Amino acid sequence: MNGTYYTITEVFDFGPHISKIILDYGKSMKGAAPSPEQFTVHVTRTSTEGENFVWPNFMGDKPNDSMDGTRRVSNVYVSDKTGAPCEDGTCLTLELPCFIMEGIGSIIKFNGNFNVFVNVAYDVTQTSEIATDDDAISPQTFDVDGGNRVIYGEW
């Protein structure tokens, strides 16, 4: 059985993007020192309307990676289930960079008329063993969506 992940969406001035993925290992990750290179993150975004988006002519050529592609991991740390750093947490939190020109991390998409929400599915693979104080965590895949939490700007 594959693992469960949770996402955190931050609302930036250029729109809402998934900035963190929390991987639930279900056991203590104390002593783990994971690196971004130990993970690959693939995302597939699909229309909630059930059909492909019309790409308007005024926007130029349609990018190939607008709905399916990979995300870069910039940082990884041991955390609790909310994504807060925690020395004896049971999760690892992956931080993902978010940029205005990289729409693959967004939870919205321009449909030709308006920005609309899209379905987002991640497939996160731990590619190498991670040592902890208790044992070693073998490579595994996380593709079961456990839910999303939105963080709005603080005023």
Regions found by a protein language model. Give the residues of each.
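Non-catalytic beta-sheet/beta-sandwich ligand-binding modules that flank or precede catalytic cores
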Residues: 1-155
